[in-house]
Amino acid sequence: LDVNIVLFNNQIYGLTKGQYSPTSPLGKRTKTSPMGAIDNPLNALSIAIGCEATFVARSIDVNIKHLGMVLQRAAEHEGTAFIEVYQNCNIFNDGAWKYATERETKTETLLELEHGKPLIFGKNREKGIRLNGMNPEVVELGKGVTEDDLLFHDEKADEPSLAYLLSRMRQPDFPEPIGVFRAVDRPRYDDEVQKQIDQAKETLGAGELDQLFASGDTWLVG
């Protein structure tokens, strides 16, 4: 279906006065978890990718230019688009994504995805992500490592393995990716249904509702 889903993730139930939510960090103390949340936080992007959403992206509420780009891409995409937006909650969870928004830290804690380009981050763009077996690892460029050794982003890959791997990269072990994780073209469900309807009409005619009601096995009740 051609729908856009935007998840504003502030790690809390803000509108209902501060209960812990499915994305609250482990141990988060709230009105409904006074001794700390005991559920591991849900990874929204991993779920969207696992459900085969054809467009999956992440941005940050205060990065207006980047957020606008992501929303524009989602609006132009034909099919289901899922966007996670890191959002602060000033009242009940202030500073939820501080590491991703502060100028002093965000170059080390975020990795901006660009299609066809290597995964590079850092204040001086001196760090990158490469695969070690089946797992990603952080490496420093220039110490026996070149850009050619790094993992290159491919948002068009039909197989969602790369997008899923990227969605699992979280602080403090990895920079957290932002941007478009996946953008693939597939036939839309509603378009395919309409094709079947049109084909049936062409083969059998438009049909009459009264005839449909009276056809096949029927019963009189009462």
Predicted region positions:
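Thiamine diphosphate
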Residues: 1-14, 66-69
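Generic beta-sheet signal
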Residues: 3, 79-85, 178-180
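Core alpha/beta catalytic barrel or barrel-like domain that forms the active/cofactor pocket
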Residues: 8-18, 41-42, 51
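Active-site-proximal loop->helix
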Residues: 15-27, 47
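Conserved thiamine diphosphate
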Residues: 28-74
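ATP/pyrophosphate-binding catalytic subdomain of soluble kinases
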Residues: 54-110
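Flexible, low-complexity linker and terminal segments
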Residues: 91-222
